[in-house]
Every structure is written in C-alpha cells, then in structure tokens.
Amino acid sequence: MYDYNEYKALIEEHLLDYIPRIDAKAQTLFESMKYSLTSGGKRLRPVLLLAACDFAGGNIYEALPFACAIEYIHTYSLIHDDLPAMDNDDLRRGNPTNHKVFGEDIAILGGDALLNAAMELMFRDFTYQFDNPEKLRRHCRAGLIIAKAAGVNGMIAGQ
C-alpha cells in the first residue's frame, strides 16, 4: 500500500469510532473533543505508524487503534498548548482554538478526555490475544512506549 493519502483517509474514516460513548450530561465535552479532532491536520503521526506497520508486514487494521490513539494524544497536546496559561493562541489550523469555542474549563477537560481515551483505546479489547502471548506482549509494549512518550519524561516535559 504505502500511500499517504490512503493511510490518511483510513484514519479520517475511523478517528471518531474509538471515542468512548458519552452520556447526555457530557455532550459538551464530546463536542469539544470532536471539534479539535476534526479540525484538519496532516495526520502525520498516525500515517507514519500505519506506514511503518505496513512496511514491516503488519496488519494496518490491527494498528489502526494505536494510530488513532496517537492522534488523540497529539490533539490533546494542541488543546492544552493553546490555553491561556501556555501559549494563549486564538487560532489553530485557521479555526478558533478549543478554549475560545468551549471555554477554558471544557478545553482542559476535553484535552484530558482525549489523553485518557487514547490510553483506554490502546489497552481495551485485547483479551482475545491471550491465546497468543507474544502478540499480547507486543501489544502491551507498544501501548507502554506510547504512554511513556506522552508522559512526564516525554511530551509533557517538553512543553
């Protein structure tokens, strides 16, 4: 495959599929998450993950949740980066930033929710792999590597 546009289209098609279902009282939070996730972007990080998987002979559909999780983490970091306490940006990708649309409180919670959704996504529904311990080990290791890269000694410290 090795086609940027095909990988990007696959990610765009499934990006919202993995957002946890939110009840009515949290609808504004969901809208905040969706707003920033669907505001465009090159999707370079998840595309690179799918391309590397494909190149190594892996199944890109098994890697798709990890690709979406990486985009959730990236989007969370952009929401928080735009906040008044950080860079205080009014625009992101030509659109009003999340905190300008939803307020600082919802923007913070929306970013936090995306980070948590990413972690949940990487570690959910993989019990089917218990019959394949090596695959389960790789799955858990990949999630741990991503979590560490996003964590206090990774992306957060870089802010």
PLM segments and residue spans:
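Double-stranded RNA-binding/processing signature
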Residues: 1-4
